[in-house]
A protein has these predicted regions:
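Donor-sugar nucleotide-binding helix/loop cap in glycosyltransferases
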Residues: 1-251
Length: 251
């Protein structure tokens, strides 16, 4: 979980396993949220889980699932179909089912009766509080909740936008359509519609200190990159969403 959330490096390139810069910023001795009590931290973790194709179930569910309402079998069959289309060897249905169970427990408070859960499984995921997936109707029915996200701060949104942009394109402009609909985009991962995005993007210049600007010239809605922003600078933008600790440290 820590490596998938970008909190520690996995040592896959021969490097030692260690806490990342983002991990220190959030959970270090002087971190913004060492006990993971602020929703901003949960949004950052969610972004790292679902904004990258490496976590297949998480990425596919938010970026490729064709409907907001679904059941467990819909996810399982969709992922098995993906594995077949990509020619991935040895993808067992039981493995996919376990992955889907883990995914649903990450975001939904209703899963199975308490009697059937282990002690570890009884602990509710902090991402449930984001309200992204709600149980509906029948036992295995769920719905992704698209719309405004009041607990998603502008700092985390700006960080996610820059992170997505860095993976998606080297161009100095990024269209609203891409931000809203491309796989791994803020619109997909945060379940924001275009109106929600426009409202947030209208203030992107202030959050990024002029590095990005929002433009609607000649009906073309896009973000313009005025100057480059490093990965470290992008991470620093999440600090906008931790005002209490920031003010205390400043004092």
């Amino acid at each position: 979980w820590a490596t998938s959330s970008g909190i520690i490096s996995d040592g896959s390139k021969g490097e030692e396993i260690k806490v990342t810069r983002l991990g220190r910023r959030l959970f270090g001795e002087h971190g913004h949220d060492p006990y993971m009590e602020d929703p901003a931290t949960s949004w950052i973790v969610h972004w790292h889980l679902c904004g990258r194709p490496g976590r297949t179930t998480w990425f596919w569910a938010f970026s490729h699932l064709p409907t907001l309402s679904f059941d467990r079998d819909t996810l399982v069959q969709g992922l098995l179909g993906l594995a077949s289309d990509r020619g991935w060897p040895r993808v067992a249905p039981t493995t996919v089912k376990r992955d889907v169970e883990c995914f649903l427990r990450t975001y939904s408070s209703r899963w199975r009766s308490a009697a059937s859960l282990s002690h570890e499984e009884e602990l509710e995921s902090p991402l449930v509080e984001l309200g992204l997936i709600k149980p509906v109707g029948k036992k295995d029915g769920f719905r992704m909740v698209r719309g405004p996200k009041t607990t998603l701060g502008d700092g985390v949104f700006a960080f996610a936008l820059l992170d997505f942009w860095g993976q998606y394109s080297r161009a100095n402009t990024l269209s609203l359509e891409a931000i809203a609909h491309e796989p791994g985009s803020p619109g997909r991962v945060f379940l924001l519609d275009e109106d929600d995005l426009v409202e947030r993007l209208s203030g992107i210049e202030d959050i990024t200190d002029g590095a990005l600007t929002w433009s609607k010239t000649a009906g073309l809605k896009q973000v313009i990159r005025v100057r480059s922003v490093s990965a470290k600078q992008a991470e620093q933008m999440v600090e906008f969403d931790f005002p209490v600790r920031s003010k205390r440290e400043a004092a």
